Amino acid sequence: MELIDSHCHLKGFKDKGELNPVLDRAQAAGIKRLITVGTSPADWVTYREMHREKTGSIAYTVGLHPCYVNADWAASISQLSTFFMPPF
């Protein structure tokens, strides 16, 4: 059986240079794909880049977490379509 982690936040690991060891541990545990969840425009580009670099193992979503909604929420929402991707 192949497992998918359907909700994780990988940006902190990437920022600390720890992404590859995290992916190695996930694979060793039987997790074949991770879906990293974008919560604000501040992480959307990072997650798209992770997906492009690790297409077989990382997918991503973009959205606004209620804690990150501010006065510019409409501008953020208007950017969402630039992050659409075909299904993996």
Each model region followed by its residue ranges:
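Mid-domain alpha/beta scaffold segments of enzyme catalytic cores
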Residues: 1-88
